[in-house]
Amino acid sequence: MDVPTRTDPPYVPIRTSRWAPHQKAPRWLLLAGALIVVGIVLVALVHKPSHAQQAGDLKSFLTDVNSDIESCSGGVRESFQALHRVQAGANSANNVQDTISIARYGASNCSPANNEQLDDLTQYQVTESLAGYHLDTAVNDVVTWAFPYAQRVQNDVANELGARDAARRQQYAAALQRDTNDLNRQRAAIDRILNKAITATGAKASPPNLAG
């Protein structure tokens, strides 16, 4: 008599560990996060600069910028004064040569590569209390006023006085007029930014005295 073959059901291991429920963030952790956000907002409000602080910081800023640009600006002013003396009749060979030397030196001094103060200005960091007044743009514009505009103007002075004939002298005089116009437009752009900041903060100050 044949004995029927026994067929057992497939073996399924019994799970010994529990299914991990979905973990929710503890309430205290959510509360701590909310408190941190509130704290950040309160700190920002507490440290919002007053008009008095902004006015003081702006005066310091203008003093710094004026100090860094004044040697270049002074050279431009001196070059124009010497040129006007020559054009007014003090045109001896010595005076002409002196004016050329003044202008060449001034042009060199308006390059950040040759002027440590101007080089400092290229790396100037505006304080956070003055954020929003576009003073970074003003600083860059002052550097550009010096180099290349002020440098070009003084080289034009030297070139005009050193010209060997009337045609070249006229050519350099036209270049001087054109570059002086560029210099003055750049100064006007700087003054617009700085005067707006001065008015907004109530600072008792003026923009840098840029020659032109």
What are these regions (language model features)?
Residues 22, 34, 52-53, 150:
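Intrinsically disordered, low-complexity regions enriched in polar/acidic and amide residues
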Residues 18-21, 45-46, 208-212:
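Short, aromatic- and cysteine-enriched interfacial helices/patches
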Residues 64-212:
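Alpha-helical segments in soluble extracytoplasmic regions
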Residues 1-18:
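N-terminal intrinsically disordered, acidic low-complexity segments at the extreme N-terminus
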Residues 24-46:
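Hydrophobic membrane-insertion alpha-helices, especially the h-region
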Residues 39-62:
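C-terminal region of N-terminal signal peptides and the immediate post-cleavage residues
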